[in-house]
């Protein structure tokens, strides 16, 4: 499994529109992508314009499919000008899942 931890800073004045588009993408990822095992959207408690994503994919093919999904490409086009700097991304390998306890 591949896990991504993405941090996005949103330009002031764009948070509400960003979140509406972000939640559409998250719903599409969870609902329409069999290889997407988890897609969580988190708001930073100290910075309301900072969003963290926690995404888990079955494998590289599932991650590649996510990046080609219509809801993802629509999201990227919609929010591109609302990023305050480039998002940071950590790619991780899942070692243990709580569901496996």
How would you label these PLM feature ranges?
Residues 2-9, 38-67:
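Short, well-ordered beta-strand segments in beta-rich or mixed alpha/beta enzyme
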Residues 14, 49, 71:
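Short phosphate-engaging motifs
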Residues 23-37, 56-90:
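An amphipathic, aromatic/His-enriched active-site/gating alpha helix that lines ligand/cofactor pockets
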Residues 2-32, 36-40:
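N-terminal first-folded block
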Residues 2, 40-49, 77-101:
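Glycine-rich beta-strand-turn "strand-cap" elements at beta-sheet edges
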Residues 14-16, 61, 97:
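Residue-level signal for secondary-structure boundary sites
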């Amino acid at each position: 499994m591949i896990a991504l931890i993405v941090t996005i800073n949103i330009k002031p004045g764009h948070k509400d529109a960003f979140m509406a588009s972000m939640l559409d993408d998250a719903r599409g990822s969870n609902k329409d992508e069999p290889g997407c095992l988890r897609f969580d959207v988190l708001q930073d408690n100290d910075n309301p314009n900072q969003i963290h994503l926690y995404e888990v994919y079955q494998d590289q093919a599932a991650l590649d499919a996510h990046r080609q999904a219509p809801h993802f490409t629509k999201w990227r086009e919609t929010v591109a000008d609302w990023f305050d700097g480039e998002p940071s991304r950590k790619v991780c390998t899942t070692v243990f899942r709580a569901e496996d306890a």
